[in-house]
């Protein structure tokens, strides 16, 4: 076998060590079908030679076949997985069984055949299940990476002004932590955080992305002429190898209720590449939990379940499913936003230290609760939100999803109790929230609450993987009973005040319609009463 040229050797090394399932392509490949296995007779499957496009996928490598003459049209797409049958045939040919096709691929060079063989071997064997694969169902992983492989989903996150601008401010405001440093971007997506690191002066950024978004990130890197700074590596951080340790790890690993999607475990796993005294952006996360009262939300979910209480729905008795319907609706966490005045006590804060906590710490999270109730009412459940801090050498920056902060794409989350509890001001509400990780990249959330000194308690278990997205974009309404003055009188006082101003304006040439000046926005008082 002839020796490899430096460029081929570099490509092989990259495929084998930096990214075991890296993207690559092979031109001038002649593809034949095995027509008769006994006689080893072959027929050309496609007219002329083809190009094979290999791209990383969470389940293996996607192999796309296109014509050398027209690469815009995909002739066939295959998946090379761990159970794919394949064998070398001579120096330039490779036999592989894909779907129902038994193919022989004849490559343009010995080196191309070697590289393709290395790609297949890296998928097929010798790699024990990674930490990620052990904790994640294949179907969940496939859906997860497919979801984040869409540009529209990346756009949704990038257009979250609070999220994106806070990350940029945290990184650029601590340029001393990035100047001439080696940076690791975990779950890079479009690569936007990698670009921020380069803006702050990073010498090198390794952008790790397991979804097909990696190819788009590479396009952005090349079109912005920063390929000498940013290296996009397709793959999971649990599976890839880096050529060196890093000074800083950046990532956006937070999900609903901070922990959903279990990306935080991946973020903590990445510390194996962090130098001693290295930085993590963000540095820690605070999960806030508070009891809330919201009769409207509770009634909404309860009435949905009552659909199954009909005894004559088109002549069919549905009532046997009412109990299960009720259970299903109340197992759904509610994703929306609310006025913080519905909270009946100061929030309890649970801290996750990204620099020191271990991955195993996030498999079972037990949070003790103790609330001093500030207002009498009915507790319908618990509200959750989170803040994360970027602890830099120059400044600390916070990203908050609190109901008192500008709204983000994380919103807030509320977990209802099927049996609400009446509680009085001054009483103590105790209990526990238990987050139990599952292989669907989420958590089962168990809530237990008890009014101290009584026999009154309530509990529920919810499926964080299956939330109800309730947010409609409508303005958040103040809780009932929070007005301490007559809203009607407040409004008309405002009208009178603005009318007087407009009368004064008329004396200086202003116009008036029905006694109300043209400079007055009467909808403001209706939509935003003080």
Curated annotation (Swiss-Prot):
<feature type="binding site">
    <location>
        <position position="187"/>
    </location>
    <ligand>
        <name>S-adenosyl-L-methionine</name>
    </ligand>
</feature>
<keyword id="KW-0805">Transcription regulation</keyword>
<keyword id="KW-0539">Nucleus</keyword>
<dbReference type="Pfam" id="PF06325">
    <property type="entry name" value="PrmA"/>
</dbReference>
<feature type="domain" description="SAM-dependent MTase PRMT-type">
    <location>
        <begin position="141"/>
        <end position="450"/>
    </location>
</feature>
<dbReference type="GO" id="GO:0019919">
    <property type="term" value="P:peptidyl-arginine methylation, to asymmetrical-dimethyl arginine"/>
</dbReference>
<comment type="similarity">
    <text>Belongs to the class I-like SAM-binding methyltransferase superfamily. Protein arginine N-methyltransferase family.</text>
</comment>
<keyword id="KW-0804">Transcription</keyword>
<protein>
    <recommendedName>
        <fullName>Histone-arginine methyltransferase CARMER</fullName>
        <ecNumber>2.1.1.319</ecNumber>
    </recommendedName>
</protein>
<comment type="subunit">
    <text>Homodimer.</text>
</comment>
<dbReference type="GO" id="GO:0005634">
    <property type="term" value="C:nucleus"/>
</dbReference>
<feature type="binding site">
    <location>
        <position position="154"/>
    </location>
    <ligand>
        <name>S-adenosyl-L-methionine</name>
    </ligand>
</feature>
<dbReference type="GO" id="GO:0045944">
    <property type="term" value="P:positive regulation of transcription by RNA polymerase II"/>
</dbReference>
<comment type="function">
    <text>Methylates (mono- and asymmetric dimethylation) the guanidino nitrogens of arginyl residues in proteins. May methylate histone H3 at 'Arg-17' and activate transcription via chromatin remodeling.</text>
</comment>
<dbReference type="GO" id="GO:0005829">
    <property type="term" value="C:cytosol"/>
</dbReference>
<dbReference type="GO" id="GO:0005737">
    <property type="term" value="C:cytoplasm"/>
</dbReference>
<keyword id="KW-0963">Cytoplasm</keyword>
<dbReference type="InterPro" id="IPR025799">
    <property type="entry name" value="Arg_MeTrfase"/>
</dbReference>
<dbReference type="InterPro" id="IPR011993">
    <property type="entry name" value="PH-like_dom_sf"/>
</dbReference>
<feature type="modified residue" description="Asymmetric dimethylarginine; by autocatalysis">
    <location>
        <position position="501"/>
    </location>
</feature>
<keyword id="KW-0156">Chromatin regulator</keyword>
<feature type="binding site">
    <location>
        <position position="238"/>
    </location>
    <ligand>
        <name>S-adenosyl-L-methionine</name>
    </ligand>
</feature>
<feature type="binding site">
    <location>
        <position position="209"/>
    </location>
    <ligand>
        <name>S-adenosyl-L-methionine</name>
    </ligand>
</feature>
<dbReference type="GO" id="GO:0120142">
    <property type="term" value="P:positive regulation of ecdysone receptor signaling pathway"/>
</dbReference>
<dbReference type="InterPro" id="IPR055135">
    <property type="entry name" value="PRMT_dom"/>
</dbReference>
<dbReference type="GO" id="GO:0035242">
    <property type="term" value="F:protein-arginine omega-N asymmetric methyltransferase activity"/>
</dbReference>
<feature type="binding site">
    <location>
        <position position="163"/>
    </location>
    <ligand>
        <name>S-adenosyl-L-methionine</name>
    </ligand>
</feature>
<dbReference type="GO" id="GO:0035241">
    <property type="term" value="F:protein-arginine omega-N monomethyltransferase activity"/>
</dbReference>
<dbReference type="GO" id="GO:0140903">
    <property type="term" value="F:histone H3R26 methyltransferase activity"/>
</dbReference>
<dbReference type="GO" id="GO:0070611">
    <property type="term" value="F:histone H3R2 methyltransferase activity"/>
</dbReference>
<dbReference type="GO" id="GO:0035097">
    <property type="term" value="C:histone methyltransferase complex"/>
</dbReference>
<keyword id="KW-0808">Transferase</keyword>
<dbReference type="GO" id="GO:0006338">
    <property type="term" value="P:chromatin remodeling"/>
</dbReference>
<keyword id="KW-0949">S-adenosyl-L-methionine</keyword>
<dbReference type="Pfam" id="PF22528">
    <property type="entry name" value="PRMT_C"/>
</dbReference>
<dbReference type="InterPro" id="IPR029063">
    <property type="entry name" value="SAM-dependent_MTases_sf"/>
</dbReference>
<dbReference type="GO" id="GO:0035642">
    <property type="term" value="F:histone H3R17 methyltransferase activity"/>
</dbReference>
<keyword id="KW-0489">Methyltransferase</keyword>
<feature type="binding site">
    <location>
        <position position="266"/>
    </location>
    <ligand>
        <name>S-adenosyl-L-methionine</name>
    </ligand>
</feature>
<keyword id="KW-0488">Methylation</keyword>
<dbReference type="GO" id="GO:0006355">
    <property type="term" value="P:regulation of DNA-templated transcription"/>
</dbReference>
């Amino acid at each position: 076998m002839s020796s490899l040229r430096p460029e081929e050797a570099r490509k092989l090394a990259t495929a084998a060590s930096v990214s075991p399932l890296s993207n690559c392509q092979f031109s001038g490949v002649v593809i034949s079908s095995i027509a008769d296995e006994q006689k080893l007779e072959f027929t050309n499957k496609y007219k002329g030679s083809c190009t094979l496009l290999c791209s990383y996928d969470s389940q293996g490598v996607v192999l796309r076949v296109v014509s050398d003459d027209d690469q815009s049209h995909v002739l066939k797409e295959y998946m090379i997985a761990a159970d794919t049958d394949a064998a070398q045939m001579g120096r330039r040919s490779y036999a592989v069984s894909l779907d129902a096709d038994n193919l022989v691929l004849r490559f343009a060079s010995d080196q191309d055949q070697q590289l393709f063989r290395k790609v297949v071997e890296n998928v097929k064997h010798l790699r024990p299940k990674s930490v990620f694969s052990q904790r994640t169902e294949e179907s969940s992983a496939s859906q997860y990476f497919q979801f984040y492989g869409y540009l529209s989903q990346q756009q949704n996150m990038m257009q979250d002004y609070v999220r994106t601008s806070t990350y940029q401010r945290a990184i650029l405001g601590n340029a001393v932590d990035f100047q001439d440093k080696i940076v690791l971007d975990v779950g890079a997506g479009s690569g936007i955080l990698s670009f921020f690191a380069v803006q702050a002066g990073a010498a090198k950024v390794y952008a790790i992305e397991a979804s097909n978004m990696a190819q788009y990130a590479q396009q952005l890197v090349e079109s912005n002429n920063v390929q000498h700074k940013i290296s996009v590596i397709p793959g999971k951080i649990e599976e890839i190898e880096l050529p060196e340790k890093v000074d800083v790890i950046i990532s956006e690993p937070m999900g609903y209720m901070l922990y959903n999607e279990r990306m935080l475990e991946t973020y903590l796993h990445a510390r194996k590449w962090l130098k001693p005294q290295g930085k993590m952006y963000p540095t820690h996360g605070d999960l806030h939990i508070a009891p809330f009262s919201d009769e409207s939300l509770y009634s909404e979910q309860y009435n949905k379940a009552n659909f199954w209480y009909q005894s004559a729905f088109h002549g069919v008795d549905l009532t046997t499913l009412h109990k299960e319907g009720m259970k299903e609706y109340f197992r759904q966490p509610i994703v929306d936003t609310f006025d913080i005045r519905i909270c009946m006590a100061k929030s309890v804060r649970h801290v996750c230290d990204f620099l020191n906590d271990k991955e195993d710490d996030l498999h079972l999270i037990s949070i003790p609760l103790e609330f001093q109730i500030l207002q009498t009412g009915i507790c319908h459940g618990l509200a959750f939100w989170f803040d994360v801090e970027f602890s830099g050498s120059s400044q600390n920056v916070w990203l908050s999803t609190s109901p008192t902060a500008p709204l983000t794409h994380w919103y807030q989350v509320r977990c209802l109790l099927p049996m609400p509890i009446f509680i009085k001001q001054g009483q103590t509400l105790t209990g526990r929230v238990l987050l139990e990780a599952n292989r669907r990249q989420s958590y089962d959330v168990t809530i237990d609450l008890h009014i101290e000194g009584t026999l009154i308690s309530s509990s529920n278990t919810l499926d964080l993987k299956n939330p109800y997205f309730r947010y409609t974009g409508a303005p958040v309404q103040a809780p009932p009973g929070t007005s301490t003055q007559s809203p009607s009188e407040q409004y008309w006082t405002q009208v009178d005040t603005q009318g007087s101003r407009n009368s004064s304006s008329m004396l200086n040439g202003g116009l008036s319609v029905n006694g109300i000046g043209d400079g007055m926005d009467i909808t403001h008082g209706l939509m935003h009463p003080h």
